[in-house]
């Protein structure tokens, strides 16, 4: 088994000639390699809808973790329920932070997402994912190279130094148009916020719509240097 500890620059290759540009082959390999020791960390963005559909074909009882920060859009929570109905055998876990919002405010002040967004992300996303990955050998992410400068070198199989794990990224070669084409073709549910200018959807407090021609990550932590929550830093 390929693990963080046994990592070597591997020569594992996947055909990119099918409709999924290698994604289905990558997922088939991942679930064969790690069996029940792999989890998909899903934010329920539009890429997530594609991956859930593909994962359901490969492993209908796969583990899926959603980092419930308690400050997501209501539309996101409603979408999760629709996904549960569409893929009832998937094991969707809504992972909560250890601190409630009130407890966080007492310790760090009100609106931590404004005063110290990095700390807020650490408490409500990074630490919960660390806990979720503690007993796993690998995790799946919906990163695409096209999304941003920080993601353009992502590979199918990555040694993830942040979480000391193997990170599997099946959609690296997909474009934004290809993601939507797949969603429409398979009549997949998706967050209606995408239809009103939100290409990337995170917490309600830190996500704004993006103007025409803007980068897909422009609406995240708008007005701040921050462009990533920290889950994908190496």
UniProtKB/Swiss-Prot annotation:
Catalytic reaction(s) noted: [thioredoxin]-disulfide + sulfite + AMP + 2 H(+) = adenosine 5'-phosphosulfate + [thioredoxin]-dithiol
GO molecular-function terms, A-Z: 4 iron, 4 sulfur cluster binding; adenylyl-sulfate reductase (thioredoxin) activity; metal ion binding; phosphoadenylyl-sulfate reductase (thioredoxin) activity
Cofactor note: Binds 1 [4Fe-4S] cluster per subunit.
Pathway: Sulfur metabolism; hydrogen sulfide biosynthesis; sulfite from sulfate
Key word Oxidoreductase present: yes
SUPFAM superfamilies according to UniProt: Adenine nucleotide alpha hydrolases-like
CDD domains in UniProt: PAPS_reductase
Source taxon at top rank: Bacteria
EC number(s) on file: 1.8.4.10
Enzyme class: oxidoreductase
Enzyme active site: 229
Localization (cell): Cytoplasm
Primary location group: cytoplasm
Keywords: Cytoplasm, Iron, Iron-sulfur, Metal-binding, Oxidoreductase
Xref: InterPro entries: APS_reductase (IPR011798), PAPS/APS_Rdtase (IPR004511), PAPS_reduct_dom (IPR002500), Rossmann-like_a/b/a_fold (IPR014729)
Any one of the GO BP annotations: cysteine biosynthetic process
CC annotations in GO: cytoplasm
HAMAP family: CysH
Protein name, UniProt field: Adenosine 5'-phosphosulfate reductase
Annotated source species: Bacillus thuringiensis subsp. konkukian (strain 97-27)
Gene for this chain: cysH
